[in-house]
Amino acid sequence: MKVNELATRQELISTPLPLWEDSYTAIPNTEIFKKIDENIRGGGLKVRNEEYRVSKTKDGIIKGVIGSIDIMTPNEEYGQRFMFRNSYDKSMSFAVAIGGYVFICENGVVRADNFDYKRVHKGTADSESLLNIDAGFEAIDKEFKIITEQMDSLKECHVDYECMHDLVGKLFFEQAAISSVQLNIVKDQMWHSDKFRHIDDKDFSAYDLYNHITESLKRSAPRTYIQDHVATHKLFENRFIHTEEPVKLITELA
């Protein structure tokens, strides 16, 4: 199996649907994109970038995807990000998440599992999933406001070696949100990043460390991409930020 390769939207649309069974309801990528595009047009939104990371079978057939749609905003530092996860082989439940991204590095920010609307591929999963795409776009402005305020507050929080070791260690040893490969990326970023401060800089902040870590999360597998970002943000929330309860998505048909 090949994991974390990039694919185009057309490749995802062209991937053949699996056969439906009594115990399985496919959620077509084509319908997901139609619903996303409908919300983008309806909201007058401008897409800055789209990225689709996929897992494939040994024969090169796409089986799972984590998609990120980056949306422009008037903010000079951050944009909005809409994410979805889907699979054609039962390896992943369908999921929707909303968050943000940092312009200069395109690192993602997912505040909580608030839009981790998860749905196994059964019953009315196809229609429910499309409703939750609508709900995600309806709530993205409110969530984005919270995220930008939180990210700005991280800039005011100094991080020393002890704090860095504690946070990175928790993500690696306790939560398994970063792998050994990603740990090395974090280490390299802390000393050699050309976008954020280094660990030995006197003004090294939680914002800098956050972005060093999320740079490594670009290597997360589609199955864990959302939860790895959630774990990272929640850890920083608990350490540095006073939070409110995240927005909730509808989880079933009315």
Model-derived regions: residue spans:
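Intrinsically disordered, low-complexity regions enriched in serine/threonine
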Residues: 52-54, 70-254
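Feature for intrinsically disordered/low-complexity regulatory segments and propeptides
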Residues: 1-37, 44-51, 185-194, 198-199, ...
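A short acidic/basic microdomain associated with nuclease active sites
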Residues: 41-69
